[in-house]
Amino acid sequence: MRYKNLIGFVWVAVIMSLFTSCLKDINNVYNPGTTAAVVRQHGDSALMMANTRFGWIYSTKLSSYSEGKCLLVSFDYDPSLPENTNAEQKGYYTVTIQGETAVNQQNAESPLTDTHKLLTNEQPILAVNPNDSVLYVKLEDYLFLPSACWTTKDRALNWQLTYDPTQQPVVENRKSIYSLYLRAAARTGKPEDKAEEAIAVINAFNLGNFIKDMREQGGRDADMYVRIHYIDQINPKDSTQFTWGVTAVSYTHLRAHETCA
C-alpha cells in the first residue's frame, strides 16, 4: 500500500510526542523509554504499583489510578536512592514517573465478526505492531497492541479484536497458532474538509476470555501463539473490494494471568 512508507515516521513522531523514548543512562539514573504498564495493588500492601516488562515499579503518582488501569509510562530509576536498597528482595523499584497516559482498554470478544464484509465506516489498518515496537507486549491478561490506521485526524474510532471461540490452531514449528482479528471503524462519516493521514494508536485488549476459550478447546498456555489479521486496503470506489493483511506469528507468550505476589 502506498502509505506504508509513512508508518515509521508517524509512529516515531507519536511516541516522541508522548515521552522521551530513548534508552539512556545519565549519572546512573536509568530511563528505559516509554513502557507499557498495568496498575495493581501490590501483594498485601496498600500501595498501588505498576507491572511492567522490567518488573514492578512504585511511584506515588500511581495512587491516582484504579486497579487494572493500563498506562504508558516514562520513568527514571535511580538505584542509589535509599528507597531502592534491597529493591530486588522487596520485589519492586521506586521510580520517578516523568509522564504517563492512559491506554484505551477493552476485551477481546467472540464471536468472530463477519470477515466477508466491512463494518460501517470501517477504516484500513496500515500495520499492526509497526517497526516491531517494544510496546507490543502482553502484561497479565492484557495485550498492548500498537497499530497504524489510515483515517482523518481527530476522528473517533471504535476498535475491536474478535476471534472464533471454536477455532483449532494451525501448528507450525511445533507452535500452536491462533487467529485474532483487529478492526477499526469510525464513529462518524468522513469529513469533507479533512484529508486522510496515518494515525498511530495503542490499545490494550484483555485476552482472558480468549485464553479461557482456547484452553477449553484443548489449547495449552505454553503452546499459545497468535497471528493478528486486519483489513489493510479498501477500494474507496467500491467498498465490497478489500483485502486482509496478517502479522507474523507473535511469540508473545499467552499464559493466563497470574496474580501478583
Task: Please annotate each region the language model reported.
Residues 129-194:
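Short helix-loop boundary/capping segments
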Residues 92-148:
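Surface-exposed beta-loop interaction hotspot
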Residues 252-261:
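Conserved small/polar residues in nucleotide/adenosyl-binding loops
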Residues 24-89:
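Start-of-domain marker
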Residues 79-84, 231-239:
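Short acidic/polar inter-strand loop motif in beta-rich domains
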Residues 187-222:
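Short, solvent-exposed, Trp/other aromatic-anchored flexible loops in extracytoplasmic proteins
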Residues 2-9:
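Bacterial N-terminal signal peptides that target proteins for export
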Residues 18-21:
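C-terminal motif of bacterial Sec signal peptides marking the signal peptidase cleavage site
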